[in-house]
C-alpha cells in the first residue's frame, strides 16, 4: 500500500494511513507500505508521533513482518522520521529513502532475507 503526503503532515494524516493499512482485507499478509513524503514540507511533531507509534505497535501483533519505506529528501522530514524510527515502533522495519526505486530494492532485499 502507498500513501502520498503533501504540505504539513499531521498525526491525523499518518493515523489515517495506518488505519487504512490495518483495515486492508489482506493486512496480515501485506509485506510493505510506502509513505511518500516527497511533497511534504513539514512532518508530525514528536508528541503526535507517540500517538502514531501506539497504533503501529497494536498493528504489529497482526502483522509483525510488514516493512515501511518512507520517501523524502527534505531534511526536516528526514529529521522527524529519524526520531520516529528511534522510538522503536517497527523494530528496524522502517527505512527512509530518496527514491521509490531504492525503497523497492530494500523491500526486495528484506523479503529475500526472510525467505532464507
Language-model features and meaning:
Residues 1-116:
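Amphipathic, Lys/Arg-enriched alpha-helical "gate/interface" segment within cytosolic domains
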Amino acid at each position: 500500500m502507498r500513501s502520498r503526503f503533501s504540505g504539513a503532515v499531521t498525526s491525523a494524516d499518518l493515523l489515517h494511513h495506518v488505519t487504512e493499512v490495518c483495515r486492508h482485507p489482506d493486512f496480515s499478509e501485506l509485506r510493505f507500505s510506502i509513505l511518500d513524503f516527497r511533497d511534504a514540507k513539514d512532518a508530525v511533531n514528536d508528541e503526535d508521533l507517540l500517538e502514531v507509534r501506539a497504533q503501529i505497535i497494536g498493528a504489529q501483533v497482526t502483522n509483525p513482518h510488514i516493512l515501511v519505506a518512507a520517501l523524502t529528501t527534505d531534511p526536516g522530514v528526514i529529521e522527524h522520521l529519524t526520531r520516529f524510527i528511534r522510538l522503536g515502533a517497527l523494530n528496524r522495519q522502517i527505512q527512509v529513502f530518496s527514491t521509490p526505486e531504492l525503497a523497492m530494492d530494500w523491500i526486495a532485499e528484506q523479503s529475500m532475507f526472510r525467505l532464507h
